[in-house]
Amino acid sequence: MTKLYIFDTTLRDGEQTPGVNLNKEEKLEIAKQLAKLNVDIIEAGFPIASPGEFEAVKTIAENVKGPVIAALARAIPMDIDRAWEAIKYSESPRIHTFIATSDIHIEKKLKKTRDEVLEQAVSAVKYAKRYCSDVEFSAEDAVRSDFNFLVKIFEAVIDAGATVINIPDTVGYALPWEFGDLIRRLKENIKNIDKAIVSVHCHNDLGLATANSLSAIVNGAEQVECTINGLGERAGNAAMEEIVMAIKVRRLPFEVGIKTEEIYKTSKLVSNLTGIVIQPNKAIVGENAFAHESGIHQHGVIQDPSTYEIIDPKMIGIPESKIVLGKHSGKHAFEKRLQELGYSLPPEQLEEAFKKFKELADKKKEITDKDIEALVSNQIKLVPEYYRLVHLQVVSGIGIVPTATIIISEDGEEIKTVEIGNGPVDAVYKAIAKAIKIPHSLEDFSLKSVTGGTDALGEAMVKLSDKDGNIYVGRATSTDIVEASALAYLRALNQLVMLKGKG
């Protein structure tokens, strides 16, 4: 069977999802799980983007073993230098350099000629080869590029030493039969194509990223670039779990090294750390992917799951457990269930999570997996508590002006404020904003029930923006929805401070 390389770009292209801001520790946590998933290549980031991004890529390169660790760089020496400095300690480093090749990008964005772009691409690959034997070249907006120019530039960069050539559908414009045909024609016309791996990178603007990727694979692509849960700019990227499971379920003749039993754990980890909720009807990993409401379907599944399920849930690692957790459950049972759900917490975080679990168990008769995931997501969101909620009291009701009294701890000092609002949450947020004088704006607030029942956990989500328009997301859970709302607001503010400082 033909080997298919899985290139995961969750930490680079996936992190460009609006509202996603991962810190170094969170990126490392995801990278380690991607290594367990057994992806072939991890694109760890874009080192030139910021000092924090550089440190995150460097940390991953130094600590994650197994996959190739790639760093993105524009086709300019400064970017390539920075990329190499970040990944040089990896046991398998790759520099991934790119330049746009479509006429609209060349003329409008780059303000160059085709010849100048060709020269810059070749120079960049030669420059990268001085550092690294494994160099990937991407022709940005390849789908809208002139075919003959694509052939010319790919032949030139392969001669310059590129080991991988990548054909991106940057704006998600292609249709599956068109994209597959493009890959086939490129393979037929690039004279030195046998010296490089052909890669594809599909965006989902028309909802066709997975279909386009599969079409490319059956037409000769040997590497597919994708993200967990389909994260990415605009409508996202091709979802890794969809591509892999399509190949596995349909028994396509390609060798894929992914450990599919790690898919569910990886999906949940990425969702919890990025704060991007998986849509319920998302293929493979959505909450409803294995749910059946129709009576006819339910009857069939009870008799034989294969009547309506083409994938065994165990195949992607969805845990099956008969253990019911409650207030009498001990730490061992709690930790075992965490491991089944894909979480591995260090001792201090495990202790804090277990403490929260026991507090919740005193309020709820039965603890569900969703409750546990909600609790643990608060523990693994590795953001320092610059501001900590010490006290919260709200007075509200019919005929009463909602009033919030809060005490927040900052560097050991307590700040007390009182504010009124249009409702209890509004009053709390005004009190927090009064106590913490950091320029920001509230962009969005939502509240949902994690599970059913009057004793359910409520999950609050807050989006804040700074003066530059950057988005920071905070989430928190509690059986008290006002408390959850306050904690979510503070977590978003703490993330802002962590990334931007208090100025």
Swiss-Prot record:
Its main location: cytoplasm. Pathway: Amino-acid biosynthesis; L-leucine biosynthesis; L-leucine from 3-methyl-2-oxobutanoate: step 1/4. Its EC number is 2.3.3.13. It catalyses: 3-methyl-2-oxobutanoate + acetyl-CoA + H2O = (2S)-2-isopropylmalate + CoA + H(+). Its cofactor is Mn(2+). Mn(2+) binds at D13, H201, H203, N237. It is found in: Cytoplasm. GO terms for molecular function: 2-isopropylmalate synthase activity; acetyl-CoA C-acetyltransferase activity; manganese ion binding. Residues 4-264 form the Pyruvate carboxyltransferase domain. Homodimer. Belongs to the alpha-IPM synthase/homocitrate synthase family. LeuA type 1 subfamily. This is 2-isopropylmalate synthase.
